[in-house]
Amino acid sequence: MQTVPPTTAPAPAPAGDRRADPVIRVKDLSFRYPGTDRDTLRNVDLTIERGDFVAVVGGNGSAKTTLCKTFNGLVPHYWNGDFAGSVHVDGVDTWDSSVAELSSRVGYVYQDFQNQLVRPTVRDEVAFGPLNFGHADYRERTDEALEHLGIAHLRDQFVWQLSGGQSHLVALAAVLALRPEVIVVDEPVAELDPARAREIYLRLRELNERDGITVITIEHHAEFIAEFARSVVLMADGAPVWHLPVQEAMDRHEDLAAHGVPAPDAVALSAAAGARPVALDVPSAAAALRPVVRERPTGERPTGERPPGERPTGADAPGGADPAPVVVTTGQAAGVDPAPAAPVEPAEPAEVVATLRGVRHGYRSVAGGLSTVLDDLDLDLRAGERIALVGTNGAGKTTLMKLLTGLIVPRAGTVTVDGIDTRTRSAAKMADHVSYLYQHPQQMFLKDTVREDISLFPRGRKVPDAEAIVERIIQEVGLSALADRDGRSLSGGQQRRATLGIGLAMRPSLLLLDEPTSSLDIRSRDDVTAMLAALAETVRCAVVATHDMELVATWASRVLVLDQGAVLADVTPRELFSRPELTARTRLVPPQAARIALELGLDPLPLTAAELRAWLPKEVR
């Protein structure tokens, strides 16, 4: 394994100072979970310097999380198994220390951070750790952590009233109040909108640079790694491949891609233009491309015609609908000027699958007031459409999906699916028409095997040829070898495929997916995206709620932008990302390739790196 050279480590501490020692030292570590026949961690040797900002990357199943759980003793003290080798944190052998003892040295924010919030108010949550450790200064620690993360104004809020980004910062403050030497954050941006994701990383950088805390993130988003990390550990098959400074790691972007971590578009495109070292951000990439970019794309074709071999996207993809014209419902009132719609030939509209008319919905606050989430919503969802719901955390995406399933009914207005008013049928009956796949896939596994979970609905409905249908779906989602495994034991990508199988087994007209690509490596993400693209043969209409703007750019035929309880814009992906005033208003961040293209002033706007390469000379591409 290649390691970070001494010149890239933080400045050395004075001679004899314990701070000169690495904060984490892993030696010949192997670990095997009970009931498995192979080691999850294999002969790991790793050193992390005090004060570093480390990104641990690798494909799903590469043991990133298992490795990091050895740092705070969860492995082997909670997740037991065959443990060999040693892990020292701040000079302490984790084998000889309890998880409680280690928690004051290593703070851990889990991927599912909501499960860490155990107290009713923000102040109580952040004070919980230092108070239970008996620290007399627990009030000072609490106030300090809240101030450092910029959430002191939330101290008296109930945790269930917070947005996803705010909840994540509270979980981080709770571990920060113990003043650890190390903070580990598992998938810090997986469930956040792009603007809040960046805020989390900015806060982590402050803690690292201002307070000297060693920060370790487990991450799939290489764009954040390139901008914020100092060093990168690439994991594969249970062991580090290398540990390198971030610039060297990005220069070896082929290594990253080979292990399921795609290089940021800034890296890949600047490398194609011959930049050495590669660019790590949008301005640097635009500067590298500007001297070679052409005045128009190579082989420019009429709108809608793709270059040979280019992957179809949006409305061009199989089953995609004609692009919807721009409809700004509240944009002018909100200060967003609508873009002029291109003239389109009149066409027979596709059959309506679901409608919402005058829909208003909200939730009661603790104080008893009604907090409106959706207000006077009118929508038609049509056959053949692939719809992306986008907006900030709390914009109402999940509420809209639950209304379509009948899990909740609107406080005013009507929702119909296949002509059925959801107020007149139970959610169980509506499941014959609409399937909803949860944001957290593990919540959908009720049985002991994937096969049983997929067969639960068709067997329960006594569907003819249920067994044959189940076997076909298992093959379609690529889980034949894992069909007899418990779904909860699968990797993130495998769980997503399994839940997609559960949804397809219901044979719905309308398929709803909540954040289907969150926490997935590039291979798993591409697998899920490809399966979504193939849904036209099985599902009449698919709706995805997502913060993944790459998925929006490559999959969607129609984008509904939710903001303050209304549809702010109803547009195609290209129209959305071509309008900086709209994305800024809704705190959306276009894919990195589109942002580079905006810097270069390219028109029509490329949405992906593949599209942007068409603007480069053939010898550069």
Describe every region a protein language model picked out.
Residues 80-92, 413-421, 430:
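Conserved ABC transporter NBD signature motif
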Residues 237-238, 565:
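Conserved ABC ATPase "signature" C-loop
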Residues 183-186, 511-514:
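Catalytic Walker B motif of ABC-type/P-loop ATPase nucleotide-binding domains
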Residues 176, 503-504:
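ABC ATPase C-loop
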Residues 158-162, 166, 486-490:
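Conserved ABC ATPase signature
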Residues 72, 405:
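Helix-to-loop junction immediately C-terminal to a conserved catalytic motif
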Residues 256-352, 582-621:
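ABC ATPase nucleotide-binding domains
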Residues 137-154, 354, 464-482:
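Conserved ABC ATPase "signature" region
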